[in-house]
Amino acid sequence: MPDYLGADQRKTKEEEKEDKPIRSLDEGDIALLKTYGQSTYSRQIKQVEDDIQQLLKKINELTGIKESDTGLAPPALWDLAADKQTLQSEQPLQVARCTKIINADSEDPKYIINVKQFAKFVVDLSDQVAPTDIEEGMRVGVDRNKYQIHIPLPPKIDPTVTMMQVEEKPDVTYSDVGGCKEQIEKLREVVETPLLHPERFVNLGIEPPKGVLLFGPPGTGKTLCARAVANRTDACFIRVIGSELVQKYVGEGARMVRELFEMARTKKACLIFFDEIDAIGGARFDDGAGGDNEVQRTMLELINQLDGFDPRGNIKVLMATNRPDTLDPALMRPGRLDRKIEFSLPDLEGRTHIFKIHARSMSVERDIRFELLARLCPNSTGAEIRSVCTEAGMFAIRARRKVATEKDFLEAVNKVIKSYAKFSATPRYMTYN
């Protein structure tokens, strides 16, 4: 159909179309648009999430949980009268030890308790304690009037031993450890497989290895692997430095070892890492003065706990040392330390991997030849390669650059590997391992 409108009229019609008012969306249209892309159960899931948030809010209000500078509940939730009544009704208890249970199978058993530095008493249980909760040798809380047993207490453990437990997992993973692929596989066979797949050992009828010795020159990644194991496993991780068990008074070191394994037995699964074990695990000798007798007693207690009369339970033990030649043969035998893993100097592939691991968190140029840098660092440990990367960053900072170049790495190799070679103890320690 021919268009009889002129250009001006056609332009006027187009302007009317453009000037036509735009209708805004109402609430129904917006709600409909929001439903696009949602699943069938989105509304029900959203309703359940809202209900959970409301319940959490009510629980926090009832329990008085609220962030404040003092850490106290709001004053509106204080109940001073009830607190005073609780203080008057609950008297402080005295710590005693149950030494013997008389007529344990009868309906009215009696308990002999020993109050330290005071006396022994034959007492009954209070109404709050069941007879099955009390065992011989257990610490209990008794009142000061009738000396009735009101509460069972956990075993006494030295605070220094409790502080050895690692609460927060380290941030080191197996991908952060370079040049130790074979060692990590052997370590995971001993630590992770028995915890995650114990049925494999039951089907074969063997007991998994319970002790591992990590030995090698300084800086080869022994402690780093232990930190990666602590990050990987959900078991309780206890870290002990060998020098912490060397105490001034007679019997203190052996007592700490006993309490350490007592605490470990209370856990579902536990991993104990002894770093620098040569501080207490040296071979026994008589120097005539008796200076090392206490250290030897501590080592004998450790030997007994590793494979003595009492079963060790689900406790794995890792030990690390730079001098395996100084350790006592009784500590090294199978049954106590079943597997010995050597951490030798990394090869070319391992050194390249270590360079890439440390450069991963640095601002570096692209196309840096890490294999060339690894070839320029023969017989170097992982710690020395890390020092090379740090020095390369220092050269970049000195030149007021934001990125480290390959030239910085080459200068760092000359400084750390070549200039500091006279300070390196790796050749000497290689003769010990």
UniProtKB/Swiss-Prot annotation:
Gene3D superfamilies from the UniProt entry: 1.10.8.60, Nucleic acid-binding proteins, P-loop containing nucleotide triphosphate hydrolases
Entry keyword Metal-binding: no
GO CC entries: cytoplasm; nucleus; proteasome accessory complex; proteasome complex; proteasome regulatory particle, base subcomplex
Localization terms from the record: Cytoplasm; Nucleus
Keywords on record: ATP-binding, Cytoplasm, Nucleotide-binding, Nucleus, Phosphoprotein, Proteasome
SMART domains per the UniProt record, alphabetical: AAA
Pfam families in alphabetical order: AAA (PF00004), AAA_lid_3 (PF17862), PRS7_OB (PF21236)
Basic and acidic residues compositional bias, start-end: 8-23
PROSITE patterns per UniProt: AAA (PS00674)
UniProt cross-references to InterPro entries, sorted A to Z: 26S_Proteasome_ATPase, AAA+_ATPase, AAA_lid_3, ATPase_AAA_core, ATPase_AAA_CS, NA-bd_OB-fold, P-loop_NTPase, PRS7-like_OB
Region (Disordered): 1-23
Presence of the UniProt keyword Nucleotide-binding in the record: yes
An annotated Gene Ontology molecular function: proteasome-activating activity
Binding-site residues for ATP, renumbered to this chain: G216, P217, P218, G219, T220, G221, K222, T223
Chief localisation class: cytoplasm
Record-level GO BP terms: proteasome-mediated ubiquitin-dependent protein catabolic process; ubiquitin-dependent protein catabolic process
Post-translational modification: Phosphorylated. Dephosphorylated by ublcp1 which impairs psmc2 ATPase activity and disrupts 26S proteasome assembly.
Functional note: The 26S proteasome is involved in the ATP-dependent degradation of ubiquitinated proteins. The regulatory (or ATPase) complex confers ATP dependency and substrate specificity to the 26S complex.
Family: Belongs to the AAA ATPase family.
UniProt-recorded name of the protein: 26S proteasome regulatory subunit 7
Species of the source: Xenopus laevis
Gene responsible for this protein: psmc2
